[in-house]
Amino acid sequence: MIRVLGLLWDPLSSWVEVSGPIILFGLYYGFIATLPFGPSKIYSMRSFFLGETLYGIIAISGSITGQLIVFLSMYYSPIYAALWKPHAITLLVIPYTFCRVFRSLEKPSSPESTHPMNSIKNPKILSLFMGGLILQLLNPILLANPVLTRLVNLFLFRYSDNISFMISSFCGWLGGHILFINLTKLVSLRLVSFRIERNSPIDHTSLRRYIHQTFSVLLISYFSFYLGRSPLIFHRKKKDNKKKDRSAAMAKKDRSVAMAKKNCSVAMVKKDRSVAEDEDRSVAMAKKGRSVAEDEDRSEPLAMVMVQEARSVSFIAKKARSVAEDKDPEDEHRSVAMAKKARSVAEDKDPEDEHRSVAMAKKDRSVAEDEDRSVAMAKKDRSVAEDEDRSVAEDEDRSVAEDEDRSVAEDEDRSVAEDEDRSVAEDEDRFVAEDEDRSVAEDEDRSVAEDEDRSVAEDEDPEDEDRSVPREQKKLKGLPISWFKQPCPIKFFDPDRIYQPIRYIGNSPFHCLKPVMRTEVSQYFFGAYSSDGKKRISFTLLPSVLALGEKLGKYRDLLDTSCLSEDPYHRWNHTMKRRRDSLENEFSDRVKALSHGSPAENVIERRVKFSNSQGDSFTEMYDPLLNGALRGTIDQFESPKMLNDLIISIISNLSDFIEIPIKDCKEGFPNDQFGYGYHISEHWQELEHKSFRLPWEPLPTDTFRSLVPSTKSSRRGKVEPISKRLYPLAERIIPNKAKKIFEEYLSNIDSSFGKLIYPKDLLEMQIQEIYTKDDDSLIHFLWLEIAFRVAYMDLAPEIASCNERIYTNSLVNIYNRIDGRNVAPTGTVKWELILSLFTTKQIFLFESLAQHEWTILRNCRGNVSTDDSTQTKDFIDLYGKILLNEPLQFREIKKHLPRWPSDLMRAERDGDGDDRGPIQISTSRIRTRKVKSKLTLDFGKERIVLKRYHAESDYRRSLIRGSMRAKRRKIMIWKRVQPNVHSLFFLRRMEIPTYPKDYYDTFDSGRVNQEQIQKEVREKIHRGKYLDPVLHNTTLAEQVCLAWPEVHYFRGLILVAQSNIRKNIILPSLIIAKNIGRILLFKAPEFAQDWEEMKEELHIKCGSDGTEFSKKGFPDKWYKYGMQIKLIFPFRLKPWHSQSKKRLRLRWSYLTTLGFETDIPFGDPKPKLGIFSEFFQPIFKKVKKGLKKGLKKGLKKGLKRELILFKKVKRRLMGSTGIRRVSRVRYIDKSELNDRIQNKLLSETETTPMGSANDSSEVNDQFGYETQTINVKDPDDWTTTMKERIESIAIINSSPITGMSLMDSEIHTGSKGSFNILGSTLKKRLVQIRRIPGRFRNKSVQLIRKRFYSMKLMKLFLKRMDRYLLLSVIHFIGSNIKFWIRSAWIRSTGNIATIYGRIFIINNDISKINRGKITNYYSINEKRKDFEIRPDRNMLSMSQAYVFHKIWQIGAIDRSYSKYFLKYRAQTSYPLIKKKIKELLDIQRILDHEKPQDLKENDWKQWLRCFDRYKLSPQIWSRINPQKWRNRVNKQCTCYEERFIPYEKKKDYIFATVIEPSLGLLRKMNKRYRYDLLSYSYLNSTKELDILNLTKDSDILNLTKDSDILNLTKDSDILNLTKDSDILNLTKDSDTLKIEKRRSGLDLKFWLFPELSGKENIYDNSKFIPGYSILSEAQERKKIEEKEREERIKVIEERIGIIRSDVQNKKVEEKQTGTGEVEEKQTGKVKQKQFGLKVEDQKTDGKKKTNQVLVQHKILKDIGEEDISDLAGMCRILIEIEDPTKFMQIYEENINLNLMFLIIYEDLKGYEKYINARDSNANDINANDINANDINAKDSNANDINAKDSNANDINANDSNAKDSNANDINAKDINAKDSNANDINAKDSNADVPKKKEDEIPKTVVSSEPYRLSSIVNDNLLIYKIVSMWLKSEKIKRAGLGDDKNILSSFNLEDILLPKRRREFRILNRFDLENDHVGFFNGKSIQNDEELMGRDQHLSVDTTQRIKRFLWPSYRLEDLLCMNRYWFNTNDGSRSAMLRIRMYPLNVN
């Protein structure tokens, strides 16, 4: 049973050790989840109070259900999406709130409504349950800090996979609710109800009703507060067309209203009595305007004007009133001047407007209500007054500000001013939903009126009214969709409303071309994490949660207890092993399913795509789950269909400034935001694909109007002046106001342009000149910059897909002149040229295209007639192309961020300039900081306004007026003086000290530095306090005075009251109480001293900053600025007074409102400055002294008693006889000793009677002691007992008995003299023991520094002590017992044999236990032989020091503990290992490898063979053998550079000027090409059986030598195929034609099963599965396939013979007749007849390069789908033909010759591979028999093979036996026959007129065919080709599925079953030797002991660099990767190193 418990205890203890903290954390966080005391808890308590237990439990259950829903929403996303949408909770709360409100208002009619009803069927139960549920879903309000709730949710989500944490948290959460229920029941039922029912004088029913109403009021208040923070659910006031018309009409009359205001002001200046009446009139007008604006939507513009008028009149009235009161001559003169100015302006206007305004004022005078509020609103909006003249408006504003300050200071009615300030604060804080919304509506109306009035002022033409409507449409962007089409929740909410609280951040004055703020909101957050030793990007948490994660990360190691008990690598290795096993099982299951006949599409693992809630998946380009080459690139597309939306954003920002002709604006497109048609990118996206203009098609001629000359013309000698070229553009794009400024700048440009090289320099000069002026030039500087960029803009030298001729014609034939009316272009412009322009120039081009298309549409609509059906059809088609088609899905997925219109800040910008419009709005719509007061300083004509802001943090600044508070942050409300606004979530971080203690610092130097820094900081603080206390106090006092201006009066009164209470009541009462206590304690009273000290205390009135004023008087304006009361020599109550009088020291403090003291004004109370600060301290000191004295006396007495007792015990133990001396000791064998003991004992028992004691001298001499007999009743029992004991002693271990016995005798002999030496030795030991604490302290300090490893060390130390002490204590007890046996005291106690036997029985049991635990148990016993006394040793010569030394070393030293160091695998970083040991272990690789391999550095061939052998590209081997390989790589790149040589050698002036700036770019392209070669060489490196034999095939890639190039005929032509991925290599190697097929996914290697890696040639795709393959099925199928192959080859040989003869006959005929060219033309005509082809011959010179992309496009354009399908069918027929005669018959009937040659070529290729595989030296097929001339002459191009092999989805790409199977040959021909015809025509088009070349010119004209795929620009040509050829790929995939099942292993790669990422993971894990590394969970026995490891003499020279090379070599080199990363992926850092897809070749351990 004990063993079973011992076995169970280890796993149980480990589980408790690991899971204990998790369970505690779960209980803790589950319990604190119930702590937030919100409305649900209040509601539950109310239910307990009113409804007793039943109602309370129901309410609690509703709350629990709500909390469960919240928790489940974290794990189940649909619940979260349903509940936490923006307005879901609001829609849920609103009806419940209304029901609660109506229910609380109604009075209960019967007592049943307040008394409980104990029935579950009561309908109130549902109401209670829903109440608790709804209230729980809302945010807690009483707990303002949301950290607790977030923390609980975060932990529940983070540890959701830990079942222990979840169960414990659930238990804690349930326990918290149970505790709350019991506490509430205790409070409500036992205490409250008991007291209410028995002791309350109020009726029980009435009291319950009061409680019911009280809680209802609390809940309603909570609901109101919650709804006040949420946005309004309905739309704001909308402006329909009628409102806009009314606003436009009222805007015209606004100027007359302004004149009427000036007229009224003149009248008020003349008459003082009319001031009050006019003020009343203004009040009435303001109220009337507000009421009209609120009640009548249609009269908003009218109400706006009336409110403006009323406010302005009231301000002018105040101004006149202050002028009349002050009688200041300057102000009076200024007011008279202003009145004259107003009168002159008013006389110029229409008197009808004045009459209308007067009538309006009379009408509004009768609607006066609430005078104080209207005055406050009028003062709030005091800057509404507007005037045409800027100076008049400024004087009015300044005078209003001055008079307002004077009225605040001197007005008799001060309460009115206070009410005004309070009303402003209330309007801004409390009535946000009402007043600020009105201000938004009024501000919108003002902006509308302002813009429309500007248009009226600019042009008085009545037609301008029509212009205002589209301009208004242009400003109101983003019109919402129809209300009925929107989803249900969105119908009632406006996401684009203006009053959303978004802050305005302006970054530059030219923010029109730059977004002011971010317009997108991030939905996903990404972060870096480590995977496979690399940093990768993945999804992460919110930024707010990351802050908490950083804090928790510091304590993660402390919380993780598992790392203390086990190796941290164990868990990782175990996890990786499980991962590998799971992948292996999954892979095997999929292979089994495939072998059982399951379709491949069901077996292959599918990638997880990123999709939305509707199930729509992202494209690969936008899928964030993809990376690297799988995702593709976005920035390389250069198609006009995929233009970036940057142009859209720029045009939207320019829409307010670019002026479009009126006729285009009035007839704009429907739903057009800008008034001049869609943007060109959106416009082209809406067109159909076939109607889109292709890159080689010309654009409309009218688009040239927007293209200004952008290059220098070659036909003119000098440059045309800039002004003539810029002015037509300025007429179109620059506003009218800036034309004069622009003309002035143009003249400056013409004069200074000759001195400058670049216009950019002049542009910078103009910028500096503009910034120095104060006019509106700053605003219009943008147009000058645009004009410069448009006029002088160099074309980019790289034009996509353009050759030399197109490029030259585009530049030479560009416009020669341009004017504003007519443009006569002489050339064509194509998309390539447009795409190379800058973004700004493309904008104007697209604008012109939009206008052009709309002009055509308008003309067609005007000229259309019903009779002409053709014209009608064209018009309808054009209309549908432009407007009606659905746009293509090329838009980016974005989340819109609502923001205000772009003209929101316009009024504020316009207010900064000197030139103001007729109506100027001076009030800003963006909130500014709260201003406390203003101070205006006059310096002559200039004025400076000093503003005093509130010290309180204002989180509403930089927000739009009227915005709601739903999105605002929660801030602390208990600190009024708060310098910065911050969230409570980060409050804990702010409280961290400036210099926190670094608990993880292990260096003393760092601590010293921190201590020095802290010391300096303390000194600075100390210096600042005592050297300049006045400045410090003054600063704080000023801050507090500014923060509390309204409470200084009451605070001063409280301070005076506290001063009197302290001096007259508190201090005397304390003195009396103290002295009464002294009298009761029989002490003398101290009344005199206390009264004297109390009188010394002085109370002085001071200012707010602590400046002393007077003892009795008050400082000036104390009620406004505050005051302080300073206590000099404050009284301190003392328990007693000392006799020696100390010198008085000046002390002071300040009194607080609560009666406490503080050291600074407005400071916090200080406990050290209280009355009792010196009262308890002396008492505590005296008590401490008494306690110390008592403890000392008690300790002395106790020690004396213990010493006396110790002496008595010592005397009794030692006895008085001492120890007898033994004369001699000799060596006795163990067997002899046992026999003598046994015989002697037996003889004594036989001869001696019972009870007698006879001493045996012989035995006593040997053992050194005397024996006594034991009285035993039965002698037989005694004999048997002694025999058993002696035998048991002998059985245990004879050597310890003998050794110990003899050692005891030796010890006895040495210690027989006296105990003096023993005493001295004990004293020495006592000294050593006293040194132990010091050593322990030193070790403790070291362990604290290495605290990370202290726990491991302690555990290691305990394990060592467990073994060391156990064995040592056993032997120590045995030796000491035997030592004391020889004393006289033992002899008197009993028989020696009994005691000795018992001791060794115990030793036997313990030894059996320890023998299994201690590994070197027997070696310890062997070491003990040193203690044995030999006969030749002299016992007397041994000293006692040596004897006691042996006693202390008698315990076994367990040196096997070092294996625990090895177990932790800490390697050289372990801090507890000495440096020398580290070096030794590092050299011998003891900590890392069990069996290090003996490899040398120089013998690289030996360790290179350890790797899997691969055949690498020459680029890699260029570093291995540079002299042999370096030049060949460079030669391959030279041909690519030669293509750009003609660009540099051109002598044409225009061409040279254009290409010269791009030479650097060309060099970069050349460098990128070389890096492309290097990169693809890494990706496409192939495997070879012997890596050292690569030099044999080295000459294959050397294509520039004559010997390596196939001898071609004179009519042959080698094409430039470097842009394609599949390349035809025509090489001569043993007269054999070899075809190289290269692609990025070339034959994926069998990494999962290395035995499948067969021989592979770099130019041969075939593989041969070895005979030892694990795929037995493939072995069986291979035999069948070989037979079929042989039969098919026979048929192919027959076909070859027939066709070869026919080809030779045709050669003879062509040479005789010389009609080769005629036959070429005839064959072309035959093709045109049969297939309907239209081929245009291109006549170019012999050096013309073939543009492959254009040719492919023309082929696909000309060939229809039907023709291609016919070709495929014909190909199928030809393949099935077996009769040669029938084959020739079809051939004679004009069947396409290229198709025939393709079939022949395919058969030849298969036949050639078969011959080469059978016999490498066979040359049955000669290249001269089938010459390249035959292929090219008969229109067989290299693209035949190229198009055939270029399909990335070819099923034979990864086939090991694809070329050997019959079915796959058929499929390959069926699929690839389609592309052959297309490439036939390609070759014919490109080679029709190519002249013949000589054989010696061939090497010069050959462009090297690179064996690697190069990157190319994705242009329109390639896109169109891919789209057209997509159905071919799908057809190929469809046919691939119809193949024979028996060939599945030969046509499918097993590794493709898994995804690439999981495949790569499986490869790496499969290479890890996880089972043989002994790194899992293993025993300590398997680890070698340190003695064995340290004793090894073998030194292994395994260097670290060699290990790294062994892992990396020969896969890749890091320095090459860095360079390749920079040029291939266009990055300068290593952020995209993961995209390289480099395969790691691990070590192949055999």
Curated annotation (Swiss-Prot):
Subcellular location(s) per record: Plastid, Chloroplast inner membrane
Ranges that cross the membrane: 18-38, 54-74, 79-99, 125-145, 163-183, 214-234
InterPro entries: TIC214
Highest taxon, organism lineage: Eukaryota
Gene Ontology terms: cellular component: chloroplast inner membrane
Function: Involved in protein precursor import into chloroplasts. May be part of an intermediate translocation complex acting as a protein-conducting channel at the inner envelope.
Quaternary structure annotation from Swiss-Prot or TrEMBL: Part of the Tic complex.
Protein name per UniProt: Protein TIC 214
Gene assigned in the entry: TIC214
